[in-house]
Regions:
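A charged, aromatic-enriched C-terminal amphipathic alpha-helix characteristic of glycosyltransferases
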Residues: 107, 111, 124-155
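Flexible glycine-rich beta->alpha loop in the catalytic core of nucleotide-sugar glycosyltransferases
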Residues: 56-58, 84, 91-92, 102, ...
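Acidic donor-binding loop of glycosyltransferase active sites
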Residues: 46-70, 83
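Short hydrophobic beta-strand element within catalytic cores of glycosyltransferases
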Residues: 75-80, 84-87
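Conserved acidic donor-binding segment of nucleotide-sugar-dependent glycosyltransferases
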Residues: 89, 98-110, 117-124
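Short glycine/proline-enriched, acidic/aromatic patches that form the donor-sugar handling elements
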Residues: 41-42, 59-62, 91-96
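Nucleotide-activated donor-binding/catalytic signature segment of Leloir-type glycosyltransferases, i.e.
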Residues: 18-43
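Glycosyltransferase donor-sugar binding loop
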Residues: 3-19, 34
């Protein structure tokens, strides 16, 4: 069956909130992992099929732009493992992910649920998006960045 794994950093001052979330998500189908190592995160990506990214959801990009993901390295990391990203449609991740090509965008929670269900019910489509996600992630490799930076500098 499917599992939801929430993984990310948690500052000490947010521990009470984390405990509250763990209490609400008290089910065997949800794992909440805080402050895990890079190796552990890599293992999660290698086992995952779908990657949700929701930074900025419920916020205003006008009044609180800092609450949005500016780039989205975790999205690229997931894509490099062939995981299909389903990202909130505002901010950096929505520029990385080309909806319907190498992942999906969502605006409301209903969209997130519907798109997740579509991926689950059509594994061949999900596989295709995952393959394209790997290709797209290659655009963000350090070596490629260095080459583009040198090309830019040489134009001056």
């Amino acid at each position: 069956g499917w599992r939801l794994v929430l993984a990310g950093g948690c500052a000490e001052e947010d521990q009470d909130y984390l405990d509250e979330i763990r209490g609400v998500a008290n089910t065997s189908a949800i794992d909440i992992l805080a402050n895990i190592s890079g190796d552990e995160l890599g293992n999660l990506y290698s086992c995952a099929s779908i990657y949700w990214h929701a930074t900025g959801y419920g916020e205003s990009s006008i009044t609180s732009p800092s609450r949005f993901e500016h780039f989205g390295i975790s999205v690229v990391e997931a894509m490099s493992a062939g995981v299909v990203p389903v990202v909130f449609e505002t901010g950096g991740p929505s520029e990385i992910v080309q909806s319907g090509i190498n992942g999906l965008h969502w605006k409301e929670l209903k969209d997130l649920v519907d798109k997740t269900n579509q991926l689950i019910s059509d594994p061949s489509w999900a596989d295709s998006l995952g393959e394209e996600a790997v290709k797209r992630s290659n655009n963000f490799q350090k070596e490629r960045y260095k080459i583009r930076l040198h090309e830019l500098i040489n134009t001056f």
